[in-house]
């Protein structure tokens, strides 16, 4: 009888863990609102597009703010929004495109991946920043890079929760 109860409890625990993990993936794959924000600088006239899919705990949003501030400091006018099917940004009108998103269960969100696949990034400087549990595992970056045409200069970074220093380095490298 005790073994049977333990087996039932183990199954309930397994189901609970799977549902918890699925909730993260569902959160990541949701379509966020169109919340375009345009930030102007008096330092220069270069343009940057920052597209970010927020994470469950707001880490990606925090990093998007860091990217925006750094780009403004380097003389870029910055447009910030979330990846959506109805966005009409022409990547060719931007000097730099920065894409930020979370990684859950070993993959980037479907919304984020679809946005990259559906947009004509040609001869652009592109920065891809993914936020995930294991920064050393960069398979997710390769998935996204493969969706971009070969005629782009792509800078990639996968980071954990508290790594704004790495963001500064990749932005500096991309804006050279």
Briefly describe each language-model feature range.
Residues 46-54:
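Acidic/histidine-rich, surface-exposed loop or edge segments in extracytoplasmic proteins
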């Amino acid at each position: 009888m005790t073994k049977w109860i333990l087996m039932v409890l183990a199954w309930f625990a397994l189901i609970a863990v799977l549902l918890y993990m699925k909730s993260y993936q569902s959160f990541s794959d949701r379509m966020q609102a169109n919340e375009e924000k345009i930030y102007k600088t008096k330092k220069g006239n270069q343009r940057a597009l920052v597209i970010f899919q927020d994470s469950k705990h707001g880490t990606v949003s925090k990093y998007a703010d860091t990217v925006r501030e750094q780009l403004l400091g380097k003389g870029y006018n910055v447009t910030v929004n979330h990846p959506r099917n109805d966005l009409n940004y022409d990547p060719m009108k931007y000097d730099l495109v920065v894409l930020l998103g979370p990684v859950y269960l070993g993959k980037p969100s479907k919304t984020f991946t679809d946005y990259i696949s559906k947009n004509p990034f040609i001869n652009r400087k592109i920065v891809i920043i993914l936020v995930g549990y294991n920064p050393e595992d960069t398979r997710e970056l390769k998935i996204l890079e493969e969706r971009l045409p070969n005629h782009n200069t792509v800078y990639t970074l996968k980071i954990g929760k508290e790594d704004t220093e790495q963001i500064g380095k990749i932005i500096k490298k991309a804006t050279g």
